[in-house]
């Protein structure tokens, strides 16, 4: 099956758009059933479903849910496209957990009533690199790097007690005499001794050629979709006072003449900080912005990153910007020049090495660091942040190698590197 859209009925009602998507798949030569997926409420199903496509319910766990969808079905199947054994987690919040005893009754109802279903998620996995998403309710809520999701298989693909409970329930609905297959042997895991970081590369020493614009502009206007971006301007007229970054997306560290002044955090609803008077008067303002994750559900899907509106200082609009896109991709990392030096200001890459004589999955502990991104042998493991709840990043065995391995940490806030060690477990 191929899904035409995902919960579109929650925030859109463009029938032509849905028909165009279905037409695309009809003409593609892919001869499989199509379906839509929406919440089990009348307006969502009416706006999100389309004739000729099966209807998926997110979730569908009772007669009322299915009756509402079948009213619109016009002869196509109805099924539960997302049954939630777990849930996602945002930075700064407790781990989202769904108790097994709360989830199993819904699964049992679907089985007893002969309904088709899909578990979301059966195996959660990881938001590697910059792929983590975000939500927005009353505030911006970026997702943590882990997409473990409290799923039946954990982030490393290992069965959990929740998996065992689901397996036991499914076994009761097997044909007489049928036997579930044995579980495979667990994948190897390993620990990594403490890694020291002896080399540093300041991000401000590795800026590309600037792009000059009157106003800052979102990173998409510079051909960039993720990572970081630096905005620099000369201060004329106003040189101190209240700095306001209108519509910041998503996290900024602010510097004046190279001195760190503080951070502005979209998750807290922050838009400003105070710039003190300097002696002599301050001349250069730097705003380094991190794109933390795009909103992927609801009416705010257009989530441009960087500085998406103007910047003011005591109500004076600051003009004349130099913009430095910092995608922090493979090409960018390949140009870093590491050396043994003490950083003068926050915003630095730190490099360490370690040796391995065996391979396996591991979890790298970043609890001593502040906020940033980690690469292992060039593979971007994702973001970490001291506010938690996630403190360890999953590193799968294929990212590691026998012999020498390299870790690069980019931290927005620390001047002195902490340590990193690998553990066999998530917590």
Stretches found by the model and what they are:
Residues 264-270, 382-393:
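Aromatic-rich membrane-interfacial microdomains
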